[in-house]
Amino acid sequence: MSTADLMLRWAIALLLAAAGVAAEDSCGKNEFQCRDGKCIVSKWVCDGSRECPDGSDESPETCMSVTCRSGEFSCGGRVSRCIPDSWRCDGRTDCENGSDELDCSPKTCSLDEFRCQDGKCISRQFVCDQDWDCLDGSDEAHCAATTCGPAHFRCNSSSCIPSLWACDGDRDCDDGSDEWPQNCGAEDTAAEVVSSPCSSLEFHCGSSECIHRSWVCDGAADCKDKSDEENCAVTTCRPDEFQCADGSCIHGSRQCDREHDCKDMSDELGCINVTQCDGPNKFKCHSGECISLDKVCNSARDCRDWSDEPIKECKTNECLDNNGGCSHICKDLKIGYECLCPSGFRLVDGHQCEDIDECQEPDTCSQLCVNLEGSFKCECRAGFHMDPHTRVCKAVGSIGFLLFTNRHEVRKMTLDRSEYTSLIPNLKNVVALDTEVANNRIYWSDLSQRKIYSAVMDQGTSLSYDAIISGDLHAPDGLAVDWIHGNIYWTDSVPGTVSVADTKGVRRRTLFREKGSRPRAIVVDPVHGFMYWTDWGTPAKIKKGGLNGVDIYSLVTEDIQWPNGITLDLPSGRLYWVDSKLHSISSIDVNGGGRKTILEDEKQLAHPFSLAIYEDKVYWTDVLNEAIFSANRLTGSDVNLVAKNLMSPEDIVLFHNVTQPRGVNWCEATVLPNGGCQYMCLPAPQISAHSPKFTCACPDGMLLAKDMRSCLPEVDTVPTTQGTSTIGPVVTTSAAVSLKRKEDPSATRHKEDPSATRHNEDPSATSTSRQPGDTPELSTVESVTVSSQVQGDMAGRGDEVQRHGVGFLSIFLPIALVALLVFGAILLWRNWRLRNINSINFDNPVYQKTTEDEIHICRSQDGYTYPSRQMVSLEDDVA
């Protein structure tokens, strides 16, 4: 390539770069330009959340010019934010200047409200509903005994449950009275226990087999004598199913799909897309007419083109010859024939039938789906039993209850609404929440105090709690507990970090940090070693990574705007999250496939904040509605109001032993305590059968030694600042202490999305020569830090340099481009002149070109995710 060509290419590249810079200087019609040049949607300006990285969309100068819409209240003052009118005089200060709580008239209850003894108002429909909606319980005082309907069973505690749930081996009443022997027939039950070889959770068939009790009356005969399907109630279909005229059920999506899925073809009756020629007694002529089927092959012309009287087809039964080529059913028609398939099969090529795998549809079963030839079977995981009436997998054991925050307290509500109490009162600004079921312990974060607390539940009046994380916290919006390994994980949206600590708060470490990210809610899967969190930064996304901070990448990057709460349904292996701007609840499997929108509703999902999954229900909190709702987690149907007037409900979790299954703590299963790690032992993601069970980690500012277990101080570090973090500098080590990284083969999965780049800040990425045990255990406060003042000065200088740099480029860049073009023209002229000079060249036969040999530079095909030196082997510990 000549010098002139090279210079021309440089000139073109600079011109394109200049055009790109100019394009970024302006935003669209419905966009707002941040001070740093970024464009956001105009309706996000002054909405209470910072979408601009520099916060200019929420600055006082910007918000002073905002005009509130109808149904909103203007705070006025220095920051004129808009809040819903419903927040006005609600007893909670929402405006920075407190104007929403000024000049409020004394609280009076309306005619449709009940006044509690403490002065608060609740809806009259909550009175005597067996639920304490007043904190003092006055709404449940002097109530008459509850009367249950004829199809319900009355518990000893006066609550009502469906009669089908009584004596089914599963405690549905909170006091277990639905399973008491005196209510189930003590003599008969005792006799059955003695003579029956089946357990209490099994059904004894008349043909002597034992089957699961939940299989009784499920529509499929499992006993040889079919005794499990005798004396059953009339079959009813699920809300997402269509009931055929013969009583059978098909998935609702198969109704009116132009295919007969019901045996009686009732699923295609009454459909809008049915034409006048559709149906078994209609025939459509080739010329367009529609005639009745009895006029076909009657030796009379009823179609203009005689297509109703073909000579060869009339009175010919094609099914007599090799069944017409049909694999199952051949139906002879007056003209031609058609192949049919039995229930549970579908026609694939006009002749062959194949089994329909109903289990490919995620909504087919509540939990487990077993595909059978021509049918399927729904089953439940351990700890659940299927309800024969609703086909829902119900948890075994005590009744579950919801725990949720409402800024100043943590409340507890049982799912049957028999108990509704204030669990932890008198809090400042509680947001994030999670539990440790086995130890009956609860954890929460307080944004005002900037601390993470822990307490034992149900302490009664003598409530006490501890601050386990009390330093280097800014906005701990998300919290999750690893109940197997005894760790807690939290997000901090200010520095954009995800951190981990033991449940005592003694050891902690930052696992993830990304400039511009805004991690919000987090959920963990300690059984498989993964964590997931929502990020409402730019771009918004959902991230996935190992619990030890490795293999982090973006799982969801499309059709997502403001992801808030996230939860994991372990039995189904699906993630659920709410999007506050899309007003939706969505789900996806843990590998990023099978995405589905469960529900979209601007009223009931006005501003969803958090959600929880239990059995077949999804529960979510809504800040604007000040309420908790529930719906079917598979279909989004059956939306119900669980609680209201909650004063900013935020995080919500479901407390039940089935939500936290037991697992192996490999850090404690080895001979060496703490897995042989000097500081922290963190579970590793189980990507394959060869993945390590755990890896060691060091506090921020320290590195793993060569033994990959002990910790050493970082050397030759260069502190840098990132964002507005004051937790500590992001440090880079010199080549002398760097560890060679292998290429991650899975990184190609996210080439289209820059945010999908995997991050690994595990200190195991570096090592130095040091003997284990030389360095004592260190806390995070001993790591290298940079003061807030120094970081602010550095950030200010950076902004100033950037402003001067932009002005300098605007002057220098055009001059440089013109100079390059002139220089390129001179080179082209000289090149043209040299070509016009005649010359004679003599090739030297001795000189041979030696640069034609190809040089191949190979790199390892192994992934970097788990270097061999990081793996901790149990056999090594035993040795």
From Swiss-Prot:
TM segment ranges: 808-829
Topological relation to the membrane, as annotated: Single-pass type I membrane protein
Keyword hit for Phosphoprotein: yes
Pfam families hit by this protein: EGF_CA, FXa_inhibition, Ldl_recept_a, Ldl_recept_b
Domain LDL-receptor class A per the UniProt entry, residue ranges: 25-65, 66-106, 107-145, 146-186, 196-234, 235-273, 275-314
Keywords annotated in UniProt: Cell membrane, Cholesterol metabolism, Coated pit, Disulfide bond, EGF-like domain, Endocytosis, Endosome, Glycoprotein, Golgi apparatus, LDL, Lipid metabolism, Lipid transport, Lysosome, Membrane, Phosphoprotein, Receptor, Repeat, Signal, Steroid metabolism, Sterol metabolism, Transmembrane, Transmembrane helix, Transport, Ubl conjugation
Positions of short motif NPXY motif: 842-847
Modified residues (Phosphothreonine): 717, 724, 732-733
InterPro entries: 6-blade_b-propeller_TolB-like, EGF-like_Ca-bd_dom, EGF-like_dom, EGF-type_Asp/Asn_hydroxyl_site, EGF_Ca-bd_CS, Growth_fac_rcpt_cys_sf, LDL_receptor-like_sf, LDLR-related
SMART domains named among the record's database cross-references: EGF (SM00181), EGF_CA (SM00179), LDLa (SM00192), LY (SM00135)
Stretches assigned to the Extracellular side: 22-807
Modifications the protein undergoes after translation, according to the UniProt entry: N- and O-glycosylated. Ubiquitinated by MYLIP leading to degradation.
Cellular compartments annotated: Cell membrane; Membrane, Clathrin-coated pit; Golgi apparatus; Early endosome
Annotated disulfide bonds: 27-39, 34-52, 46-63, 68-82, 75-95, 89-104, 109-121, 116-134, 128-143, 148-160, 155-173, 167-184, 198-210, 205-223, 217-232, 237-249, 244-262, 256-271, 277-290, 285-303, 297-314, 319-330, 326-339, 341-353, 359-369, 365-378, 380-393, 667-681, 677-696, 698-711
Chief place where the protein resides: membrane
Region called Clustered O-linked oligosaccharides, residue ranges: 717-788
Source organism superkingdom: Eukaryota
Cytoplasmic topological segments: 830-879
A GO molecular-function annotation: molecular adaptor activity
Compositionally skewed regions (Basic and acidic residues) per UniProt: 740-762
Function, as annotated: Binds low density lipoprotein /LDL, the major cholesterol-carrying lipoprotein of plasma, and transports it into cells by endocytosis. In order to be internalized, the receptor-ligand complexes must first cluster into clathrin-coated pits. Forms a ternary complex with PGRMC1 and TMEM97 receptors which increases LDLR-mediated LDL internalization.
Domain comment, as recorded: The NPXY motif mediates the interaction with the clathrin adapter DAB2 and with LDLRAP1 which are involved in receptor internalization. A few residues outside the motif also play a role in the interaction.
Assembly and binders: Interacts (via NPXY motif) with DAB2 (via PID domain); the interaction is impaired by tyrosine phosphorylation of the NPXY motif. Interacts (via NPXY motif) with LDLRAP1 (via PID domain). Interacts with ARRB1. Interacts with SNX17. Interacts with the full-length immature form of PCSK9 (via C-terminus). Interacts with PGRMC1 and TMEM97; the interaction increases LDL internalization.
Stored PANTHER family: LOW-DENSITY LIPOPROTEIN RECEPTOR-RELATED (PTHR22722:SF15), LOW-DENSITY LIPOPROTEIN RECEPTOR-RELATED PROTEIN 2-RELATED (PTHR22722)
Protein name: Low-density lipoprotein receptor
UniProt organism field: Rattus norvegicus
